[in-house]
């Protein structure tokens, strides 16, 4: 049905509902009309329909319907780039959804708002919009995780997450948060593959391909785009496939393969475009590519016998590339032109012009120093022409300025340019040079700017004696004749040609290329460089592979990226094909070409989770020690795969991964001494094997220049082909708008099992299912006339088969869909989907491959290019590609019930035919057993694939407990008090959903180092070498220290888990790390297993009040702190809000003797909120001997409250350094005096350093000393207002006591010498140790001390220090 027919039908239904007064039905019609119009780009008309829908729903007071209408209006406004109005409606949608407490619509609303903010960023490059988009997507994701889990089907939740992950990936890519971007894209692709979400998979792969392309990673880009193209073919969305072909052509142009780019563009043209401007862009790009191809062919002809013609062609190519902003290729063309010109001994003037072109191009590439070199060469060749010398000197100055050279290098260039312009009497040029020099001087040398300004004024007043002549040379020479219409080969009749004629046309075209050698039939390749054997291996056609090899097809040809057929078979998990290829001599350790980063078939298989294939490769001698260019061995590749997908793996897959890891470790130990020499014997410096390769690699040698951003600086004015203007503009950061969630997916997912996560190289969309999952294939080989027989054969073929469940032939359809029989005459559009047999011998280039790119297993590295343009476009909105979903929303949920009557356009109609249902193997319902281990309850599925015993169940439960808690228990199981025998089969003693109790009989506790390694592996965390050394050296010590390592939470978790049940540990020091609040629970779990711990140092660990609260609340009723005697929480941002938690902590530490709370951010308001609780806790701390509150700005009032609460009879050591709130806080000493004069005060050491104390404060303190005879140590250092007067007062007071002080510190006080003899007598009689540090002490003081000290005393007399101690 055409668009007009659908519109006419819906309009009639709308009019009928209007006549009958059925407002709801009329609103439904408006909704459908709006959707249909928007899908064809008629946004204004669609907006009017949705506005009418809103009015109708408001009149019937349908709140949910109004909310959806606001969302649709917002989407249409966003598509029309009226973002402020769009956000207004979307926030109304959010408010209405909130008023209904509808979490489904709330999730949609936040996702829609985030998408619009992302559009705003594309429009105006506002970072604030990006941050708002990120926040909105995260809120939407939080609703999915916290509110919708269990409310919707798993498929709907997966589709929501898929789209949100994609949008978050795009947002992080714009924010240049590369690691997060990669993780989000991986999750999106994995979920889309797992749940057969082909439209979302297309978007993720397309956008990831665009990111790889912008990052210069062409190999990954091609594979992602090919995967996206497969999705488009599977959905029969020609416009989407056209977009992929368009972007593929851009990648191929970057690689220098313009013939392949031409074929991709022709396919894009034949497939058609949704919007007229896209079709125009394709045509113009094709004109540009055709021009390049023709010039390159002419250059091949001319290079051998016509150097003059070759030189002219190089100039035309350079001009063409320059106009296309492809400056590296333009530079190469101009360099070749210069080479030919020098061979021909062309005149200096011609050489100067070439140097100028090179300099201009290098400037566009930001390589300014090389540009200066060519400008200098031009200057040498143009000697004597004052005007040209002036322009060249001016260009040199501009280039040096862009390079950031110093003013001393810039000024002479502009001055020489000005002098030459004066000689040429060109006043306009003089003014231009002086004006620029004046600007430079204002920025770099302001004192010289005044003279230049005066010269400018004088020059402006001078009358020009002659008019300026336009000396700009006409550089727009026609590089070639206008393109003939026949050369375009784009007549509409091509659309009607059958596939055979198209293939012959391509072959004729390629055979007609000049300079092509005749190639054999096995070297016929498609756009990706794939041979017949490549395609058969990708598609899992074992019989086809066998036939090709028997007919003599080479075993090891490479595609354009460097992959061999064995790589492809391993990548897609086709076990039997791998076995066959190995039997016939395929290179088992081939590292791939330049674009493959040294990935061997074994790496490929492990990176996709194909363990059976990996096992076969190892058995056949694959090296387990070869490393990729990223330095990854096969074992490390497997560990990365497990780390990435661990949470999504089922138990069986985890067990297979663990088994494979052990296998690799064993094989590594055996191969370590004799690695396979295959790496040296396989040529990896060419893209193809010698037996089938063209003369050189199709991928050009990468230039040293970094890939230019798509938003390049304006091209030079040199143009030879006017029609290529828009074709050569590099596409900017294109994104496909995620589809709306207005309807649930109607794909039949009955047969969708959670698949093993495979990090494919993203060329063809392959879905790997479980071995027994039926696969109704749609390939031509399996299509037969009977629908029932086809479905049956497909199901039987899938049972126990290792064939790939490829995405495209396995596209899910409804259970009542009949496979359409294939006719002998293949329609043209279907031929496109399989068009690949093209004789493709690329143009002669450097033998080097494309630029090194990231490993396919690490395709996440995609550095975003800088943007210089504000406006960014999208290639096409998905609105027009699929009417099932709409733009501007990032999730999928069920449509509200009020709108459920709306018909959805989902593609081909599904007919009811029971015969079309595939025959499924019926499995009994699964057995799930609940196992209780201490406080943890685990639900463990028991697979039917084998009979498992109770011992197996105990092992599974122990592994789950280890994954959760970090400890591996040995268990016995009981059911209703009865002990279960380990050898009994589970079905004989348990039923589904039974709960059994697990008793821990013992713990598996290997050496500390091994426990740490096992915890790191379990958590997917890399080992920290310093922690590993600490574990090894301190394993038998009662003390463990990992201080000052700055370990983050992820690194601390395996450390803490390894320390669990380390019962011999008495001291744990973790100072100087980044524990933080989130890790407090993990710390508490560890402390609960250390009953003998007496010292805990958590200082400087970013622990806040929330973390302290978690420690306290979790320890209630436990023994975590029962024996702790010393606790250090210093330098943690606890703040005043921790008072309640601190009080509780004191109560949970009944034997605490030392508490250090230095620099915890306590302020004068400390003790106010929970004074009673905290005061009571301190008073009850009867064992507390040492308390440090130093470096907290408490002030006198707060200090008074603290001291009132402290026990007087037990506290011996009190540190109060730098607790004054201000310098004028003179009353600080008063609460201290009150404490010291309390009855029974037992304080022995008091620190009051750095509190701005004066002699008056010391005098007051001295008066109370006779009342506190227990005080024997006093620290008054760093109080510069304390002088000799204060010292004398204190010494006099000490004479009234039975004993003096064992320690007295006055370092940093204003003690001025020389001290009199009486004072020295008091010092030596009352003090056992004194520390003085003052610049005012004299030599006489030092001499006096040395003379008076008794025998055996120690002294330190150096600089301003004067210390002594009587032993």
Curated annotation (Swiss-Prot):
ANK repeats lie at residues 528-557, 561-590, 597-626. LRR repeats lie at residues 1062-1086, 1090-1118, 1121-1144, 1181-1205, 1240-1263, 1268-1293, 1324-1347. Residues 666-684, 894-909 have a biased composition (Polar residues). TPR repeats lie at residues 27-60, 67-100, 107-147, 162-195, 202-235, 242-275, 311-344, 352-385, 390-424. Residues 844-857 have a biased composition (Low complexity). Residues 772-781 have a biased composition (Basic and acidic residues). Residues 692-713 have a biased composition (Pro residues). Residues 465-509 have a biased composition (Acidic residues). Residues 460-509, 660-714, 726-785, 798-820, 841-910 are annotated as: Disordered. One of its GO terms (cellular component) is MCM complex. The keyword DNA repair applies. Keywords: ANK repeat, Chromatin regulator, Chromosome, Cytoplasm, DNA damage, DNA repair, Leucine-rich repeat, Methylation, Nucleus, Repeat, TPR repeat. The modification Omega-N-methylarginine is found at residue 797. Belongs to the Tonsoku family. PANTHER family: TONSOKU-LIKE PROTEIN. Component of the MMS22L-TONSL complex, a complex at least composed of MMS22L and TONSL/NFKBIL2. Interacts with the MCM complex, the FACT complex and the RPA complex. Interacts with MCM5; the interaction is direct. Binds histones, with a strong preference for histone H3.1 (histones H3.1 and H3-4/H3.1t). Interacts (via ANK repeats) with histone H4; specifically binds histone H4 lacking methylation at 'Lys-20' (H4K20me0). May interact with DNAJC9; the interaction seems to be histone-dependent. Component of the MMS22L-TONSL complex, a complex that promotes homologous recombination-mediated repair of double-strand breaks (DSBs) at stalled or collapsed replication forks. The MMS22L-TONSL complex is required to maintain genome integrity during DNA replication. It mediates the assembly of RAD51 filaments on single-stranded DNA (ssDNA): the MMS22L-TONSL complex is recruited to DSBs following histone replacement by histone chaperones and eviction of the replication protein A complex (RPA/RP-A) from DSBs. This is Tonsoku-like protein. The lineage of its organism: Eukaryota, Metazoa, Chordata, Craniata, Vertebrata. The gene is Tonsl.
């Amino acid at each position: 049905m055409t668009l007009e027919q659908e519109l006419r039908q819906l309009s009639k239904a709308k009019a009928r509902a209007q006549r009958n007064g059925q407002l709801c039905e009329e609103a439904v019609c408006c909704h459908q009309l709006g959707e249909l119009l928007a899908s064809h780009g008629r946004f204004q008309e669609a907006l009017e329909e949705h506005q009418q829908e809103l009015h109708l729903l408001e009149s019937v007071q349908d709140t949910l319907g109004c909310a959806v209408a606001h969302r649709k209006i917002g989407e249409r406004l966003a598509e029309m780039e009226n973002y402020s109005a769009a956000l207004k409606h979307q926030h109304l949608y959010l408010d209405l959804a909130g008023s209904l407490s509808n979490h489904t619509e709330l999730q949609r609303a936040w996702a829609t708002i985030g998408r619009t903010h992302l559009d705003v960023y594309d429009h105006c490059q506002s970072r604030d919009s990006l941050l708002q988009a990120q926040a909105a997507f995260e809120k939407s994701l939080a609703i999915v995780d916290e509110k919708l889990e269990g409310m919707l089907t798993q498929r709907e939740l997966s589709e929501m997450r898929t789209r949100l992950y994609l949008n978050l990936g795009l947002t992080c890519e714009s924010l240049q948060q590369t690691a997060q971007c990669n993780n989000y894209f991986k999750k999106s692709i994995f979920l889309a593959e797992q749940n057969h979400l082909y439209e979302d998979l297309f978007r993720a792969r397309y956008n990831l391909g665009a990111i790889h392309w912008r990052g210069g990673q062409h190999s990954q880009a091609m594979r992602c785009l090919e995967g996206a193209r497969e999705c488009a073919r599977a959905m029969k969305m020609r416009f989407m496939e056209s977009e992929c072909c368009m972007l593929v052509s851009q990648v191929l142009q970057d690689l220098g393969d313009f013939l392949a780019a031409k074929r991709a563009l022709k396919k894009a043209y034949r497939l058609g475009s949704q919007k007229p401007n896209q079709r125009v862009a394709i045509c113009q790009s094709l004109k540009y590519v055709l021009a390049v191809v023709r010039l390159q062919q002419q250059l091949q002809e001319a290079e051998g016998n016509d150097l003059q013609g070759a030189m002219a062609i190089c100039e035309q190519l350079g001009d063409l590339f320059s106009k296309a902003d492809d400056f590296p290729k333009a530079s190469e063309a101009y360099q070749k032109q210069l080479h030919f010109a020098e061979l021909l001994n062309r005149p200096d003037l011609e050489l100067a012009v070439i140097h100028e072109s090179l300099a201009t191009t290098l400037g566009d590439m930001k390589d300014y120093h090389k540009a200066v070199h060519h400008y200098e060469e031009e200057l040498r060749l143009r000697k004597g022409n004052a005007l040209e010398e002036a322009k060249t000197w001016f260009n040199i100055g501009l280039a040096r300025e862009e390079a950031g050279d110093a003013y001393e290098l810039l000024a002479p260039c502009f001055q020489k340019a000005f002098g030459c312009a004066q000689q040429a009497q060109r006043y306009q040029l003089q003014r231009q040079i002086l004006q620029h020099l004046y600007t430079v001087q204002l920025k770099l040398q302001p004192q010289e700017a005044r003279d230049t300004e005066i010269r400018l004024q004088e020059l402006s007043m001078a009358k020009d004696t002659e008019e300026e002549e336009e000396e700009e040379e006409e550089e727009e020479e026609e590089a070639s004749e206008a393109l003939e219409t026949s050369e375009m080969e784009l007549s509409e009749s091509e659309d009607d040609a059958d596939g055979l004629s198209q293939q012959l046309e391509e072959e004729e075209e390629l055979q007609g290329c000049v300079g092509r050698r005749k190639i054999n039939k096995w070297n016929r390749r498609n756009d990706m460089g794939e041979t017949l054997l490549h395609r058969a291996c990708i598609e899992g056609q074992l019989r086809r592979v066998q036939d090709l090899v028997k007919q003599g097809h080479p075993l090891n040809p490479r595609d354009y990226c460097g992959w061999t057929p064995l790589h492809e078979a391993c990548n897609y998990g086709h076990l039997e094909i791998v076995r066959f290829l190995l039997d016939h001599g395929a290179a088992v350790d081939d590292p791939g070409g330049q674009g493959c980063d040294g990935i061997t078939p074994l790496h490929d298989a492990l990176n996709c989770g194909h363990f059976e294939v990996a096992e076969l490769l190892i058995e056949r001698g694959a090296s387990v020690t070869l490393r990729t260019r990223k330095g990854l061995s096969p074992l490390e590749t497997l560990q990365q795969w497990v780390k990435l997908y661990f949470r999504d793996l089922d138990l069986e897959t985890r067990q297979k991964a663990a088994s494979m890891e052990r296998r690799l470790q064993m094989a590594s130990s055996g191969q370590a001494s004799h690695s396979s020499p295959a790496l040296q014997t396989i040529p990896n410096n060419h893209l193809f094997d010698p037996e089938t390769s063209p003369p050189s690699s199709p991928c050009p040698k990468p230039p040293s220049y970094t890939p230019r951003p798509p938003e390049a600086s304006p091209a030079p004015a040199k143009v030879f082909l006017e029609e290529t203007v828009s074709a050569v503009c590099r596409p900017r950061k294109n994104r496909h708008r995620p589809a709306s969630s207005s309807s649930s997916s109607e794909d039949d997912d009955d047969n969708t099992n959670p698949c093993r996560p495979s990090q494919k190289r993203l060329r063809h969309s392959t879905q790997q299912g479980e071995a027994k999952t039926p696969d109704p294939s749609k390939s031509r080989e399996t299509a037969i006339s009977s629908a029932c027989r086809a479905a049956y054969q497909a199901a039987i073929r899938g049972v126990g088969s290792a064939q790939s469940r490829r995405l495209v032939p396995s596209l899910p359809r409804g259970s009542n869909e009949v496979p359409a029989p294939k006719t002998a005459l293949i329609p043209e559009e279907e031929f496109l989907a399989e068009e690949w047999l093209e004789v493709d011998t690329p143009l002669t280039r450097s033998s080097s491959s494309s630029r090194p790119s990231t490993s396919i297993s690490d395709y996440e590295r995609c550095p975003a290019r800088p943007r210089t343009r504000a406006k960014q476009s999208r290639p096409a909105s998905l609105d027009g590609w699929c009417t099932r979903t709409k733009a501007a929303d990032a999730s999928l949920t069920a449509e509200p019930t009020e709108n459920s009557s709306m018909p959805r356009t989902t593609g081909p109609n599904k007919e009811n035919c029971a015969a079309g249902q595939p025959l499924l193997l019926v499995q009994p319902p699964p057995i799930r057993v609940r196992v209780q281990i201490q406080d943890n309850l685990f639900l463990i599925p028991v697979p039917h694939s084998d009979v498992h015993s109770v011992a197996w169940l105990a092992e599974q439960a122990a592994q789950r407990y280890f994954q959760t808690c970090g400890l591996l228990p040995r268990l016995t199981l009981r059911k209703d008090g009865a002990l279960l025998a380990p050898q009994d089969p589970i079905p004989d003693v348990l039923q589904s959903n039974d709960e059994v109790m697990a008793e821990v009989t013992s713990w598996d506790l290997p050496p500390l180092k091994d426990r740490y390694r096992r915890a790191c592996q379990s958590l997917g965390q890399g080992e920290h070498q310093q922690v590993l050394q600490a574990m090894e050296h301190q394993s038998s010590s009662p003390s463990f220290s990992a201080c000052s390592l700055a370990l983050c939470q992820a690194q601390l978790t395996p450390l803490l888990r390894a320390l669990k049940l380390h019962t011999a540990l008495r001291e744990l020091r973790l100072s100087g790390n980044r524990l933080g609040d989130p890790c407090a629970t993990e710390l508490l779990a560890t402390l609960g297993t250390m009953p003998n711990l007496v010292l805990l140092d958590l200082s400087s660990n970013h622990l806040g009040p929330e973390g302290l609260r978690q420690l306290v609340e979790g320890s209630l009723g436990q023994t975590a702190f029962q024996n702790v005697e010393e606790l250090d929480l210093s330098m943690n941002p606890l703040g005043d809000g921790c008072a309640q938690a601190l009080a509780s902590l004191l109560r949970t530490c009944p034997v605490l003797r030392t508490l250090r709370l230095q620099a915890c951010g306590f302020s004068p308001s400390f003790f106010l909120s929970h004074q009673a609780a905290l005061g009571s806790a301190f008073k009850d701390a009867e064992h507390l001997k040492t308390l440090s509150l130093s470096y907290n700005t408490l002030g006198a009032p707060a200090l008074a409250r603290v001291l009132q609460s402290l026990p007087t009879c037990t506290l011996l050591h009190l540190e109060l350094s730098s607790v004054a709130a201000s310098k004028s806080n003179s009353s600080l000493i008063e609460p201290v005096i009150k404490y010291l004069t309390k009855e029974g005060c037992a304080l022995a050491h008091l620190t009051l350093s750095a509190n701005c104390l004066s002699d008056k404060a010391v005098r007051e303190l001295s008066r109370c000393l006779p009342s506190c005879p227990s005080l024997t140590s006093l620290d008054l250092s760093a109080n510069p207002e304390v002088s000799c007067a204060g010292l004398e007062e204190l010494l006099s007071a000490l004479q009234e006591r039975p004993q003096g002080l064992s320690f007295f510190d006055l370092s940093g006080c204003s003690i001025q010498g020389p001290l009199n003899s009486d004072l020295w007598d008091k010092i030596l009689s009352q003090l056992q140790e004194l520390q003085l540090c003052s610049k005012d002490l004299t030599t006489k003081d030092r001499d006096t001390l040395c003379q008076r000290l008794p025998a055996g005393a120690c002294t330190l007399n150096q600089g301003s220090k004067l210390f002594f101690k009587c032993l």
